[in-house]
From Swiss-Prot:
Source superkingdom: Bacteria
Enzyme class: oxidoreductase
Disulfide bond annotation, renumbered to this chain: none
Primary location recorded for the protein, binned into one broad class: cytoplasm
Subunit structure: Homodimer.
Protein name per its UniProtKB record: Glyoxylate/hydroxypyruvate reductase B
List of catalytic residues: R237, E266, H285
Organism taxonomic ancestry: Bacteria, Pseudomonadati, Pseudomonadota, Gammaproteobacteria, Enterobacterales
Family indicated by similarity: Belongs to the D-isomer specific 2-hydroxyacid dehydrogenase family. GhrB subfamily.
Any Pfam family matching the protein: 2-Hacid_dh
GO molecular function, one term: glyoxylate reductase (NADPH) activity
Amino acid sequence: MKPSVILYKALPDDLLQRLQEHFTVHQVANLSPQTVEQNAAIFAEAEGLLGSNENVDAALLEKMPKLRATSTISVGYDNFDVDALTARKILLMHTPTVLTETVADTLMALVLSTARRVVEVAERVKAGEWTASIGPDWYGTDVHHKTLGIVGMGRIGMALAQRAHFGFNMPILYNARRHHKEAEERFNARYCDLDTLLQESDFVCLILPLTDETHHLFGAEQFAKMKSSAIFINAGRGPVVDENALIAALQKGEIHAAGLDVFEQEPLSVDSPLLSMANVVAVPHIGSATYETRYGMAACAVDNLIDALQGKVEKNCVNPHVAD
C-alpha cells in the first residue's frame, strides 16, 4: 500500500502524476483549521505533506501523528515550526538551489528600476506628460561603478554579486556571518561590519532569511546611517525590516529610494504609504516568479518528498539529523 500524502498546492499535471506513482495523494485547498477538521481522517493518516505559503505549526502536527516528512515549494521556511518538526522527528525539505539565478535577476531589476526610475517615468509617459524633450526632473542615477552593499552573502548574494561585478563594474561590499573567500576572490568583494556597509554603499541589498535574530534587523538606526542618495533593496523577507521605520526614512529623505519585493504583511495593504511614493518600486513577492523557475521548484519539492520518505536526506533537508 502506498504511503498517504497531502498536497495543499496545485501542481502541473506531470508532477502530480509523478507524485501519484509513489503515494496516495489527497489534495486540499489549504491548511486552515476548518480544512483540517473537515479532513481529519486524511490528516491523521498522512505520512507526507507538500505545498507552500501555509503555516505548519505544532497545532497542525498534533493532528498528523503519522507525518514523517514535509516538503515546501520554497527556499524559505520561516512559516514552519522547525523545533516542533524536529522534536517529532519529521523531516523538512526545501528548494534552496533552483531559484538562485532568478531571484538574483529580480534583485538586479529592482536596482535598475529604482535607480533609473523606470516605473515612475513609464507611468508619466502613459499619463501624457511627455510633451517635450525631458529635463532633470526625469533623470535617474547611474548604476555602473556605484558601490553595492550585500547583506547576506549566500547563494543569491553570490549570484547578485556576479551580475553587479561583471555586468556593471560595481565595487562589492558584503556583510555576513563569516568571510566568503570565493566572493572575495571572484568579485573582489570586501567584507565589512554592517555600519560600514551602510555608510559606504550606494545600493544596500538585503537578502536574509527571517529568524529571531534577523527580525527587524533594519530599523530607524540603520536607515539613518545610510547615504541620503542611497537606494534600499529588499528581496529576502519582509519582517527583517521595520516597515514603519523604512517609510519614515523615505518620507524624511534619509534614503533616496527603495525597491521592495517583500513586506511585513503580504499582500501589502492598499493603504500603505509605500504605494503613494514615486520613489518606491513595490512588486508582489515575484523573486522566483517565472514559469521555468516555479516549475523547477515544484519538481524539486516533489523529488524531495519522494527522497525523504525513502530515507534519502543528503540534500535539501533543513533538519537531516532527525533521520539518524
